[in-house]
Amino acid sequence: MASDFIPVTLIYDTGADFLYLDEDYLKLNHLQNAFGRKGKATMGGAGNGEPERIDIFIDPITVHCGAREYQNEITPIIKLRDLLGCYTDGLLGNTHLLMNPLEINFSESYLRQLKGPLLAEQLDNYVKLDARFEDNRIDVKATLQIDDENSLEGWFRMDLGCGSTIILTNETASAFNFMDVPKAYFCTQAGGIGGGSEEVTIRAAKFCMADTLENLVIDYSLNEKGALSSDRPYIGIIGNEIWSLYDIVLDPVSSSVWVKRNENQGTYAQSSVTHMATVDRTDICGGWIVNGLYKGGVAEQAGIEIGDIIVAINNRPVKEITWEEQRKGLELQGETTYTVQKPDGQIVSYTLFIGKQII
């Protein structure tokens, strides 16, 4: 909850600093002026655009999270739902949540701030990663093998605000010969704070961190600006498709990251079968906005474009599809009809033959 006990749904983002609130969440709940004075700031992020001028709240906001209370000094207002959908109201970063050791339990879906480090016997089944805590961020060392000719070892940024597996920076990918590696080109309208993004999806033979994952789907960035471009202190980022396989303890005092494999089998070896990415924006429109497309995929070939609004799938309005269903996956197969609203308001139906992974 934020000040005055207004409920909010926040994502813990290890790639962020403090509290960030979504612009549409504030507008739809008539909270644009609920938290005091405003100012302006310039902010960049993972997107491929220039840093943007955004509104910020310059008066402190008190955040109640469980039994904890945080005083947030400056709160940026960002277009977060364009990226993550209508069930997210904001982000909470490391400044507040990493004041003490933090337990992140994906098995039972909870975060818990600890009063002190866990005892050695409590960490018996955990693996300690090679980690560093610098500039309010967390990096871990890992090894990635693309194929027999391409492998790398180095620091990867821990990014719990990213829903992907691994994304290599543009600079990292440029050092390798991916000419003979099967690939799929992906472009998004909103690829992170700072605008859209361009990526290439490939398969990697192995990823070694706490244990070894095989045949995983990863991306490398083509962005020339932002957090995935070049001149970064890491070779890529690791997102929740990987981290959700583990229960985690973060200890900022000793700069330690401990992980324990859980029972989640994950979807890291599966690539897109619809060949597009959508964002549920039923808070502001009639459906899901197409945010990204794979070049030459079944969605693009059918005529779907970035910015289209999907209003129904197989004649079922997407407004009826719950968040729980979306998270589990719709398991669409074969001939599938998408009813789409184009930017000019025209309603068009497209038939996609769903089944083949993009890579």
Model region roles, listed by residue range:
Residues 1-359:
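Pepsin/retropepsin-fold aspartyl endopeptidases
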